[in-house]
Every structure is written in structure tokens, then in C-alpha cells.
Amino acid sequence: HENHSPVGAFKIRGGLTFFDALRQQGALPRAVISATRGNHGQSVAWAARSHGVRCTIVVPHGNSVEKNAAMRALGAELVEHGDDFQASREHALALAGQTGALMVPSFDLRLVRGVATCWWEFLRAVPQLDVAYVPIGLGSGICGAIAARRALNHPVRIVGVVSSHATSY
């Protein structure tokens, strides 16, 4: 179960594959930065700490107290900025430019590769699955599902879903 991973979500697979790819290329940065509301930040913080890399996570004001505490507990420096994810993201990009930290977007291909492993396992375990309804969010989950489906030549129909109340970017 993904909820039994160290961060309680599939996102950790993305963070670990992202940092492993950098390590294999001899390109581990001194510091990374990202914007998130939670699980992506936990993934990046966990993987950064595992690789001895400083991590800053930018979250919007009013973000989940529990998610913020979890990211801090994993070693991330937390910066609260803006009223929504987009404002946090823009601030993270500006900080990356000022500090030289590597920006880690949640939809980076190296992250999606890790997320796809979850779908790879699931689709292999359920070959008769007809349809999977997948939250779109910022894209790593649904892109991982599609990548795994294509790699396995699985017939499942992937349907992206989003709340009618979700902010659009």
C-alpha cells in the first residue's frame, strides 16, 4: 500500500527516482527548491535528505498544518508565501534564481518515471481492468498512469478527473 511508504503517498517514488537520476549523472545539486501543498514536498524532502541535499519547500499561507509539519520533520526548510499554489510556485522559481537551488517541479519527467512504477505494478496486478479514474492534480499521477499503460500495452482506459471546485492554472 502506498500509504505505508515513509511519506504515506505514491509521490515518494517520484522523489527517489528524480534524485537517483541526478546521482547517476553526477549532477546532485547542493540545494533544491519546490512548491507544493503537501505530498510532493514530502517526497522531495525525503529524497533530498537521503542524498544529503538541502531542501526548501514553498507553500501557500493557510496550507495544511499537518503537511507543513511533516515536510519540516523530513528536513525541509518551509517558506510560506502567497495565497495559492501559483503564487508559491512563482516565489519558488524566484528563490531558485536567487540562490542557485535546483527547482523541482512536480511534473518533471524523472519524477513521473517513479510515479509510473506504482501504475506499472497496479496494471500488472489487474490485467482485466477496463477503466481507471485518475486525479489530474498537477499531472504526475495521470502521466505516470498513461506511461505505464503504454509501456505495458495495457488496454485500460485512463480517465482524468478534477473537482469542479479546483483552482485552474
Give a label for each model feature.
Residues 1-169:
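PLP-dependent amino-acid enzyme catalytic core
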